Design a protein with these regions (language model features):
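Insoluble glucan recognition modules
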Residues: 1-285
Length: 285
């Protein structure tokens, strides 16, 4: 028996997993303590229930992934195998950078700041920065030199362009987003949200962080695993909060980007989470 799916990868080396349910686990009791593993990944190149992600291919683009099942006793790998075939290579840029006085400086590559790939949205990148109104910035497809820099695409909102540089109207924390596929660049008020038990629920768009100068802060409502994400103006992000998820590890902000679930970060009720995106740091106290 063959099962096929088409996957549009954002970047070269993107990965996926196989699920037989709407999750890689099925809860077997009310409390969710006992679970059955029903997903498939790779262990030493072979299919297994507890394996890692399946790398689609070395190039970004459309892939046809075929999962083949044949009844066989023994290990999972004796019953399941897969193939990944590139059917259309992507022509979209695989990266986006910010450069300029409003970001860090005008010198490549040291002053260029990499934007984050949005999960499951090919060609979309995002970043949060505190930007001062009188300091200009630009976008770039590369971080090595000038020549691929730009101030916008087809549709541009939330900023002005003067002397071939971008400017915001006032000092503040901004969400910068680029969609190469649809030719869109937006700059909007940055919004950070908590998600899950640590913030009292799983409702998207609730549990907003507070802006404190050039930082975000929030207080956890209960014990649980810390999960956070950035709000987006892009339609594909609606209902997909995890497309722009991140967390704090050893004092640094680390982004999910195109990867799987990040490692759990346990917190207790009443802890203060502080995020400094310009510095790339965070604290949980």
């Amino acid at each position: 028996i063959d099962f096929t799916a088409t996957v549009d990868t954002t970047q070269s080396g993107d990965s996926t997993k196989v699920e037989f349910n709407d999750d890689i686990n099925i809860n077997l009791d009310v409390d969710g303590v006992v679970k059955a593993e029903v997903g498939l990944g790779l262990t030493d190149g072979k299919m297994s229930h507890t394996g890692g992600n399946i790398i689609a291919g070395e190039k970004a683009g459309l892939y046809t992934i075929t999962l083949t099942y044949k009844k066989s006793a023994g290990a999972i790998a004796d019953s399941f195998s897969y193939t990944c075939t590139l059917t259309k290579e992507s022509t979209l840029p695989e990266a986006c950078y910010l450069i300029g006085e409003g970001i860090k400086g005008w010198t490549f590559p040291g002053d260029a700041v990499a934007m984050i790939p949005a999960h499951s949205e090919p060609g979309c990148f995002w970043a949060i920065r505190y930007i001062e109104a009188e300091k200009g910035f630009k976008f770039s497809e590369i971080n090595t030199d000038w020549g691929k820099d730009f101030t916008g695409r087809t549709t541009n909102t939330g900023y002005t362009v003067k002397d071939n540089n971008c400017y915001v109207a006032e000092n503040g924390l901004y969400m910068l987003e680029v969609d190469y596929k649809n030719g869109v660049v937006t700059v909007s008020k940055a919004m950070i949200y908590g998600m899950g038990d640590a913030f009292g629920g799983w409702n998207e768009g609730a549990n907003a962080f507070t802006v404190s100068g050039d930082k975000f802060t929030a207080t956890t409502a209960a014990a649980g695993n810390l999960r956070m994400y950035a709000g987006s103006t892009f339609a594909a992000a609606t209902g997909n909060w995890w497309h722009r998820e991140f967390n704090v590890f050893d004092g640094k902000i680390e982004y999910r980007a195109g990867g799987g679930d990040q490692a759990a970060v346990a917190v207790t009720a009443g802890q203060t989470v502080t995020l400094d995106f310009n510095a790339g740091t965070g604290s949980i106290q």
